């Protein structure tokens, strides 16, 4: 169902990034959800961060970002 732009895994966390250019961070987060990029971590005990990031082609910088955290840990 598509490809995630970047995943970073550490012993305690999983970071799922979706990048947009001249879009919105909300649009990027929506894509993570709609495409099911976090699905393979549904039973993972680490905290999962979904991060939507938008780059502005006009300024060459990040102009918007949003994150959402979830945890499947029982502790």
What spans do the regions from the language model cover?
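Mg2+/Mn2+-dependent nuclease catalytic core
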Residues: 21-38
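Conserved catalytic cores of phosphodiester-cleaving nucleases, focusing on short active-site segments
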Residues: 6-21, 35
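Domain-level recognition of nuclease-like catalytic cores that cleave nucleotide substrates
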Residues: 40, 44-75
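Generic hydrophobic, helix-prone segments enriched in Leu/Val/Ile
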Residues: 9-10, 28, 37, 62
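A short, polar/proline- and glycine-enriched secondary-structure boundary/capping micro-motif
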Residues: 16, 27-29, 75
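Generic "edge-of-domain/loop-turn" microfeature
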Residues: 13-15, 24, 42, 60
């Amino acid at each position: 169902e598509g490809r995630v732009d970047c995943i970073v895994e550490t012993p305690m966390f999983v970071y799922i990034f979706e990048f947009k250019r001249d879009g919105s961070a909300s649009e990027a987060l929506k894509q993570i959800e709609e495409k099911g990029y976090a699905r393979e971590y549904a039973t993972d005990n680490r905290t999962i961060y979904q991060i939507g990031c938008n780059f502005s082609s006009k300024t060459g910088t990040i102009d918007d970002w949003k994150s959402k955290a979830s945890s499947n840990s029982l502790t």
